[in-house]
Amino acid sequence: MIPVRCFTCGKVISTVWEEYQQRKAAGEDPKEILDSLGLDRYCCRRMLLSHKETVDELYPYT
């Protein structure tokens, strides 16, 4: 689950997550994707670049 907002500046980032994932899977450069999505601040960029889905791994333990 991607956070709704950037932890540092509060900008909404969850709206671009799916497009980012699709374009990254298609082989596009992450820098170009983030630039075109309007994520200029490094705090917002790191939210997408460093995110790892762990929900599926934790689901069996609920």
UniProtKB/Swiss-Prot annotation:
Gene3D superfamilies: Homeodomain-like. Zn(2+) binds at C6, C9, C43, C44. Its EC number is 2.7.7.6. It holds the Pfam family RNA_pol_N. Its main location: cytoplasm. SUPFAM superfamilies: RNA polymerase subunit RPB10. GO terms for cellular component: cytoplasm; DNA-directed RNA polymerase complex. One of its GO terms (biological process) is DNA-templated transcription. Keywords: Cytoplasm, DNA-directed RNA polymerase, Metal-binding, Nucleotidyltransferase, Transcription, Transferase, Zinc. It comes from the Archaea. Binds 1 zinc ion. One of its GO terms (molecular function) is DNA binding. Its cofactor is Zn(2+). Part of the RNA polymerase complex. Belongs to the archaeal Rpo10/eukaryotic RPB10 RNA polymerase subunit family. PANTHER family: DNA-DIRECTED RNA POLYMERASES I, II, AND III SUBUNIT RPABC5, DNA-DIRECTED RNA POLYMERASES I, II, AND III SUBUNIT RPABC5 FAMILY MEMBER. This is DNA-directed RNA polymerase subunit Rpo10. The gene is rpo10.
